[in-house]
Amino acid sequence: MVLAAITLKVGAYGFLRFILPILPDASRYFAPAIIVLSLIAVIYIGMVALVQTDMKKLVAYSSISHMGFVTLGLFLFSGGYLNDWALQGAIIQMISHGFVSAAMFMCIGVMYDRLHTRNIADYGGVVNVMPKFAAFMMLFGMANAGLPATSGFVGEFMVIMGAVEVNFWVGALAALTLIYGASYTLWMYKRVVFGPITNPA
């Protein structure tokens, strides 16, 4: 939880607080390359998360994909574009991701304590045993998926809007992660919480 909530943000905070103000010319020069790398991270890691069978690995890969949004937003701002949408979206995404990913890892930890496995196929029917927990996990699962009216949506949407202002195709590629995020998070939630009971424990 500490890794997801705090440590992952150190690099992005370092960019925002030190690298961008101290080395503005270098930031502007390398911005196109970092924007491309961020898009690769957002899309490719989202695809990797889709095939995970381990809950913890799935949430970990989704965290990497979300942090790709943060670097994308930061360098859309610093690359000479001065895009406020992207910068504000990156900051909101950092804050949101800190709470959401920590909560998701906590949910996985609670389930692991009961069955001592993180394999998605070993779970099912959690809502019948722990309905309040299922509601809690649904709330943060929706935010992790980036569904509207959640904090996860606000940051990603602002970065995408900023990207569209700079280049339509950058924004379109970044928007793919909303599809991936909804796919892997909701699939995991449906299987674990509403799926058939495979283990009565």
Residue ranges and their predicted role:
Residues 198-201:
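Short, intrinsically disordered, charge-balanced linker/junction segments flanking boundaries
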Residues 1-196:
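Hydrophobic transmembrane alpha-helices and their helix-loop junctions in integral membrane proteins
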